[in-house]
Amino acid sequence: MLFANKISLIRLRTWLILYLVLTIIGVYRHVLWRDEMQGWLVALQSQNIFELWSANAPSGHPILYPLLTYIATLIHPNPISMQLMQWLLAAISAFLFVRYSPFAKLHKILFLFGYFPFWEYCLLSRHYVVLELLVFCGAMLVTSKEFSLLLTSIVVALLFNTHALGWGIANGFLCVSVFAFSQAGNSRKLISSTQRSWIKICAVIFYILIVVYYVAVCNTQVTQPTT
C-alpha cells in the first residue's frame, strides 16, 4: 500500500510523459526484426497503391497498416519513419487510455508500462498498434452519450481491414451499434439523411475493397522453395 500511495502522488501526466520518453528511446535503439523489415520493404518497393495491394496479398494481412507504412515511405525512405509512425499511434492510444478510461490511476500506470502497450504495440512495427487505437476509439464511441452510428461504422470498417484479431472485436462493436439502433426505434434519432447516404457509400466501398483484396490474394502465386 505504501508503494501504491507513493505512485498516486505523481500525476498521470508525468507518467504519460515518462512513457513517451522511454518508448521513443526504445524506438531509436530497436533493431527491426525480419517481419518488420519485410513489411517495410514491401511498402518501399511498391510504386503505387495498386502494386502495394498486390505485393501485400501473400502476407494474408489486410491493407490498412501496409498503407500507413507506404505513406511513411513517401515521407522519408528510411525505416525510422515507419517506427516513428508506430510510436505516434502508440502515443495517441496511451493518451486516450489515460485520459478517458474508467480505471483507477494505479491500473492506468500499470497498463502503460505493461508488455503489450510498451513493447509489442509500440516498439515493434506491426499491425497491432492500429488495432489497439481503433479498439479504444470504438469503446469511446459506443459509451458516448451522443451515439454516432457513422463514426462507429467507420471504426468497424477499419477494424475489419486491420488484422484478423480485429474481426471479432469489430463484430462486437457492430452488435452494439445494431442494438443501439434498434433501441432508438426510429433511425432518424441516430442519423440524418445525409449521414445515411454516407453510410451507404462507405458500405459499398468497403465491400468492393474486400472483393478486390481477396481476388488479389487468390490470383497471387506464391513461389514454393525447391528441394
Language-model regions, residue ranges each:
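Perimembrane helix-loop-helix junctions
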Residues: 2-4, 141, 169-207
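Transmembrane signal-anchor helices characteristic of membrane glycosylation enzymes that use polyprenol
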Residues: 8-36, 203-222
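Membrane-interface alpha helices of multi-pass inner-membrane proteins
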Residues: 21-23, 117-121, 136-137, 149-175
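Short hydrophobic/aromatic helix or loop-helix immediately within or flanking a transmembrane segment
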Residues: 40-88
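Transmembrane-helix motifs of polytopic, lipid-linked glycan transferases
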Residues: 84-109
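Transmembrane and membrane-interface helices of multi-pass
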Residues: 106-118, 132, 136
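Short acidic/glycine- and proline-prone juxtamembrane loop motifs at membrane-interface regions
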Residues: 123-130
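Membrane-interface transmembrane helices that cradle and orient dolichyl/undecaprenyl
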Residues: 136-152, 181-185
